[in-house]
Structures are given as structure tokens and as C-alpha cells.
Amino acid sequence: MLEKLIILDFGSQTTQLIARRIRELNTYCEVYPYNKLPEDLSGVRGIILSGSPYSVYDSKAFRIELSELRGKLPLLGICYGAQSLVHQAGGKVEPCDSREYGRTHLTLRQPEDALLTGLQSGTTVWMSHGDTITSLPEGFEVIAGTEDVPNAAFRIRGEKTWGVQFHPEIYHSEEGTKLLGNFLDICGMKRDWTPASFIEATVQELRERLGDDKVILALSGGVDSSVVAVLLNKAIGRNLTCIFVDHGLLRKGEFERVLQDYEHLGLNVIGVNAKEKFFAALSGVTDPEQKRKIIGRGFIEVFDEEARKLKDIKWLGQGTIYPDVIESLSITGMVIKSHHNVGGLPERMNLRLVEPLRMLFKDEVRRVGLELGMMPHLIHRHPFPGPGLGIRILGEITEEKATILQNADDIYMSLMREWGLYDQVWQAGAILLPVRSVGVMGDERTYEYTVALRAVTSMDAMSADWVHLPYDFLAKVSNEIINKVRGVNRVVYDISSKPPSTIEWE
């Protein structure tokens, strides 16, 4: 049985960073909403309680009865998680005179404590909280503090339970990863979860689950579906048929390039031209969520049609990854935005889903692909959304707009490669805005569309920063697009980070 660590999410923006740090330590972990702890804890070796935007005293605060967890498994509370442990045990948590935010230095009171093994006294840690622990309950003891936060870290005597008021998952906490590693050692984790072990376990699981069943896989040309294809091919061979749909919203020349790439991989691929179907279904639709769902339904309908042409197809493969799953439903149950690989599926789908990568972050998918021996140019392609340019054309989607955006995007991507910038950027693309503006070309007045350029850096798509592209490069891209793409007379650059913005505009 796969051993794992569970992270209970109380709504912190850094919960996914905790998961990333644990995964980087070759340990498998899963994130669950604070109130959705699985009943079956077989294989679970420990639990981390995340931070939260709330105070423990807020009426809207997310709460669970922590006494039911204490003593059963090793437990680590971070920020709000630590304060909840104290508050529920009768200690005092009070508002800070001023919000404690930023770097500070940690003084070790008990450096021999198992959680602090190998840490240096004075190490930098990152604080971000409006409340602070002012009094510990009986049985709790301080193991580290800072100048302003004397109870920065504590343990509970007789239990494998700890709490820290700082954020070890944040990069600014210099030895945060070491502290998390110490907790994994306390949990008895083997730290042997690697791309190779994932491949071995996943291939075995796929063989057991699928048996002699046949699978069709939704190919997009991106790294996620590419890795799924190779994994499934490794597990079931010729029982896999790949379906690549041209919905008219791919990048320029994408359909032909993708078919050629997969032919080289020895995969059985069927190309389907469904442009007319998608453009007809999207006619007149402007709502972003509706566009996503229409595109999602269209994909499934096409797959169903293709499956009926084949014999005994029972499964639909998809390249869903962990950020897709997490972003599709927030902790409060409010949809942030549905993902093509998660939402938009018809209620009566004729095929069952198989999603081998649904618990991996993007960088982990890439490492698995390299371990599988896939071509680097497939593995290091920028992420591209399942709905394609459909969520980069704001407002109504038409074939004319799709052509405009394909041409603009092609210029942008080509120049990125020419200038040696492509591999320095996590994701980039052009967006066609539903905005026309006045311009002048020659002696004539124009009234045409605006294209926005987007380029971000990221580790796992859970957060992202905009890229400071050279001005000369941006000027070159702007001039090329305006001069060569009919229908565009203005180019702008998006300088928004995630959060609060998302990587895609829709």
C-alpha cells in the first residue's frame, strides 16, 4: 500500500506549496478540504494542518475537532493550524498589535527536539498572521521563538504533535524544507516516491484496473496528454487508441505537427476534424463558463462518436492534473472555474474515465515524461489549455477571430524561440480581446481588435508571476502582429500575477 501524508486545507493560499515541498522530499501527499478527511486512513502516516485566512475566533472560521486526531497520527499545525491546536486545548490566541508579516529570525529553545533537528538557531523564517499565541495550554511546551513571537513553535508532551506559527513551506523560510523533512522522519516516511516508482506503480495499477479493456485517449498535443498516452501504451499497448480532435481552436499548424509527433512515438492515433461542430455550438455564446462547458461536452460527444466506430471501447483517458482538480472546487464549495478535463462532462457519458496523472503537479508530469524517455520538445512545451484558444478569445468565438488569434499567437511564439526566451518562460500566449480601438494605417483610419500578450513563470500553476520581457522584444512582437495580422491594430502586455489574477483570462 502506498504510504502518504495528508494535508488538511483550511483555506490558505499556501496549502499547495506545502504539498509541493512534501513532494520535493520524495514523499506522496494529498490535499483534502478541512472537513473531508477520509474515513479510511490506511497508509496515512501523518497529517499537516494548513494556515487559513480566518482567525480562530471568526464565526466563519473553518473548524474541526482536533482532539479526534491528536495522538492517533503525527500532527503538524502550521500558522492557523497551530493556533487551532492551542485554542481548542484551552490556550490563548490573541490579535497582534500589528499584523506580523515577513522575515524574522527563529531562536531554538530546544534544538534537540525531533522537529528542529539540524536547524540553525537564528535561521530565517516567514511570518504571516494577524493573531498570535500568547499562552500555551497545560502539556504544551515551547521549542522555538522569535523576538516578537515567543511561542513560534511548540510540541505537546506525550504526543507526536507540533505547531509552528511561521510558514516552513514558503521559500523565504531558509530551512523550512528541512523542518518538513524532519516531520516526515517523525512520521516514519521512507521518502522513496520518485518518477520511477510512480511509473512502476501506475502501470501496474492500470493493468489491474483496465485488464483487456480498450481505451480511447483525448490527445491535446500538450505534455499532460502526451505522458498519459505513453503511460497507457506502456500498460495496455495496442488496446489504446488515441483521439486527436481539431476543434478549430488549436495553435497554427498544431494539428499536423501533433499527428507527426505521435506517429514517431508509435501510438495509434486517429485525427478528427470537428471545426464546424464546435464553431456552431459556440455561436453567440459569450459567458466564459458556458464556453468551457460547451467545449468539454463537444469533446466527449466526438469521443463517443469515434468510440462507436471502434469495437468494445470502455474507457476514456484524460490528461487531468492536480491543479485542475484543486481549482475546480474551492474549499467552500464555490467553483473558481471549471476545467475542461474535470467539468463540462455530460451527465450520461458513455465511457468511464481513467486519469493517471490527476494527482501530479505539472513539473512532476514533466519528470515522469523524461523518465519514460519521451522527446524533450514534447516534455518542455508550454502548457496549453484543453479548450485551446477558446478561452483566449474573449466574448463570442468565431472562425474569423480564431484565425486572427492563431496568426498573432504564431508570431509571438516564433519570436520567443528566435530570441531564446521560450524555455525561460513557463507559459505564454496571445489573447484576443473583445475591444476595438481606433488606429491609423497609411492614410486610413482603422477600427480593429486588440491583442494582449501573456507570459508567466511558475512551478506548478498554483501561483505565477508575470515575466519582465525585454522592451525591444515586445516592440518587435507588437510591430510584427500589427503589420502582418489583418484585423489587429493594437497590442498590450499583461503584467498581472496569480493570485489575484489567473494565468488564463477565462
Swiss-Prot record:
UniProt cross-references to Pfam families, sorted A to Z: GATase, GMP_synt_C, NAD_synthase
GO cellular component: cytosol
Cited CDD domains: GATase1_GMP_Synthase, GMP_synthase_C
Catalysed transformations (reactions): XMP + L-glutamine + ATP + H2O = GMP + L-glutamate + AMP + diphosphate + 2 H(+)
Domain Glutamine amidotransferase type-1: 4-192
Active site: 79 (nucleophile), 167, 169
Annotated keywords: ATP-binding, Glutamine amidotransferase, GMP biosynthesis, Ligase, Nucleotide-binding, Purine biosynthesis
Pathway: Purine metabolism; GMP biosynthesis; GMP from XMP (L-Gln route): step 1/1
EC top class named in words: ligase
Binding locations of ATP: 220-226
Record carries keyword Ligase: yes
Entries under HAMAP family matching the protein: GMP_synthase
Function: Catalyzes the synthesis of GMP from XMP.
PANTHER family in alphabetical order: GMP SYNTHASE [GLUTAMINE-HYDROLYZING], GMP SYNTHASE-RELATED
Protein name: GMP synthase [glutamine-hydrolyzing]
Originating organism: Porphyromonas gingivalis (strain ATCC 33277 / DSM 20709 / CIP 103683 / JCM 12257 / NCTC 11834 / 2561)
